[in-house]
């Protein structure tokens, strides 16, 4: 069992906590050569250990040339992921407590009697005064509150996503739809989300219209492993 980090923005953290998100898509880097004619699939075992866990693209139908790409952090089914999210370490002396002066996370204790502090998360908590949030990429493993188990990893084109998979991404329509989350509305929401994660200078290569190859990583919530 490998334990690895994964980053999510605040909106997606809320979707995971709400039970709406069980899938994420990440860019394949580097993108396979456009001349490739078929996909070999994942390398399960090889005398060339560096290729194990990689996905192979064949450049011609006879396999004369193969391009290998590796999932981010080498994600594979069975891996345990800890979510890095926007966070802060809030010390007790900065906390006013609840209406009774008790710790919001441990109501049986007065904040005056606590010295350990606690981790706060932008997705669900508020901080006060001059305290500032730390970027998710800097969150230590010990601060992680969300743990995931990878159930599937595959490669596909971005625009191959279906309406059911868009739901698994944690997206919902921005307004009430009487009949259903229609395909057009769903794709529009996902298009906006995807393009918001891409630098403007890279939209022509990695944006929705470019239809890049992506890693599809499916997961489920799990408990923090013992001893971690």
Q: Residue spans of the language-model regions?
A:
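Secondary-structure transition motif
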Residues: 1-228
């Amino acid at each position: 069992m490998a334990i690895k980090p994964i980053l999510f923005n605040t909106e997606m953290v809320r979707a995971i906590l709400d039970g709406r998100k069980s899938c994420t898509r990440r860019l394949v880097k580097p993108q396979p050569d456009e001349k490739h004619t078929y996909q070999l699939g994942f390398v399960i075992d090889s005398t060339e250990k560096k290729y194990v866990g990689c996905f192979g693209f064949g450049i011609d139908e006879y396999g004369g040339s193969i391009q290998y790409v590796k999932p981010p952090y080498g994600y594979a089914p069975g891996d345990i992921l800890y979510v890095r999210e926007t966070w802060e370490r809030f010390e007790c002396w900065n906390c006013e407590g609840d209406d009774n002066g008790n710790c919001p996370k441990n109501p049986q204790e007065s904040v005056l009697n606590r010295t350990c502090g606690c981790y706060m998360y932008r997705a669900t908590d508020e901080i006060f005064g001059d305290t500032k949030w730390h970027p998710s990429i800097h969150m230590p493993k010990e601060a992680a509150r969300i743990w995931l188990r990878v159930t599937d990893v595959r490669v596909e084109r971005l625009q191959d996503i279906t309406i059911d998979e868009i739901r698994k991404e944690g997206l919902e329509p921005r307004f009430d739809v009487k009949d259903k989350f229609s395909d057009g509305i769903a794709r529009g929401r996902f298009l906006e989300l995807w393009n918001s994660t891409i630098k403007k200078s890279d939209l022509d290569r990695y944006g929705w219209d470019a239809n890049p190859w992506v890693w599809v990583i499916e997961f489920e919530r799990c408990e923090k492993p013992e001893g971690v």
